[in-house]
Amino acid sequence: MLERAFFTVTSYADYKEKSEEKIKKGIIARKDLEKASIEELAIGTYLNFNFFHTPISDQVDFIGIERRLQTNIHDYNALPAKQQLEMDIPLQNIEVGHTPASIRESLLEKVFKMGDKFVRAVKKEYAPGIIGPFSLQSVITKDLEMIVYDVSLRVPGNPIVATTSPYTKYQYGTTFGIGRRIAMEIKRAVEEDRIKEIVT
């Protein structure tokens, strides 16, 4: 069973045909399909923006950016359109890794605002709010609109950020990942006798 059995459709008839085919092949179960969500596919560049919120100083650190590598969609998209049409193979979005990314500087302010806005919203709705790392999985459209389509509230499985991101270096003078940022937070909380503020 796939962790995420995504598939794309262009109409209700297409949905019925593809879902029945996947049920017959055992890729998805009918009972799971009945609970599934249907989402609009946003066309643009997909990026994961990784942040860290520290309650100690109530600031949001921007840790870095990466992109998912997915099979078989990524390599399939590298083929010329004519070959794609001739091959007629089923596409899947199975995550197999990550690749580092950056963003043009004129868009950075939008990224920072997204992180700050998310932290404020979570604090308002679910006190005490987000503590530690989170990732805003986003797409940037052709109009440079940033759409967050999913949120990851955990230590991201992308160790490449620790060695490739320039953003922690701008703020702290060195490049590091989420693990070291968590360690820095714990050390500071212990030194200031505020450990209860970062654990639940």
Describe each region flagged by the PLM.
Residues 15, 44-48, 71, 75, ...:
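A generic structural micro-environment signature
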Residues 121-126, 193:
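Solvent-exposed amphipathic alpha-helical surface segments
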Residues 180-200:
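Cysteine/selenocysteine-centered motifs that mediate thiol-based redox chemistry or coordinate metal-sulfur cofactors
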Residues 146:
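Hydrophobic "anchor" residues on beta-strands that sit immediately upstream
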Residues 38-39, 50, 126-143:
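A short glycine-rich, hydrophobically flanked beta-strand micro-motif that places a catalytic Asp/Glu
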Residues 51-122, 152-183:
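ATP-dependent carboxylate/phosphate-activation module, predominantly the ATP-grasp catalytic core
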